[in-house]
Regions:
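Flexible, glycine/small-residue-enriched loop-and-beta-strand segment within the central core
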Residues: 1-60, 77, 88-89, 95-97
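Short-chain dehydrogenase/reductase
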Residues: 49, 67-68, 73, 84-86
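Acidic, glycine-enriched loop/beta-strand segments at the rims
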Residues: 63
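Short arginine-rich
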Residues: 78-82
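A short acidic/histidine/glycine-rich donor-binding loop in glycosyltransferase catalytic cores
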Residues: 83-84, 91
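A glycine/serine/threonine-rich, flexible loop-to-helix segment
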Residues: 97-103
Length: 103
């Protein structure tokens, strides 16, 4: 996790191994002395499951009760609640009611 602006992670989230969450490009690109790539907040709402090897970049907004599949890249996307997303670029796979861990 690399935070230069703001990263908000809700309650009961599950973030698997080898994930990257970064709200900055870690460098500035200036056009006519104006910063063209500012840092941007990341919001991950409650009960989101982020599977392994996923990258979430600046400007991402993941609504509650989402699943983000393994090896996905979330770039400035708004992911709607109660859905499974996967891929690079990220795509909606299906809608569902809820997810939970099995005992």
């Amino acid at each position: 996790v690399q935070c230069l602006k703001s990263i908000k992670i809700g309650k009961e989230c599950s973030i698997a191994w080898n994930c990257t969450i970064i709200d900055s490009d870690l460098h500035g690109i200036f056009i006519n002395n104006i910063l063209s790539n500012p840092n941007s907040e990341i919001i991950i709402e409650d009960k989101v499951w982020v599977c392994s090897n996923t990258t979430i970049t600046k400007g991402a907004y993941i609504e509650k009760n989402c699943i983000v599949g393994a090896n996905s890249v979330v770039v400035k996307n708004k992911l709607k609640s109660n859905r499974i997303y996967s891929g690079s670029p990220i795509k909606e796979i299906k809608e569902f009611e809820r997810w939970g861990q099995l005992n």
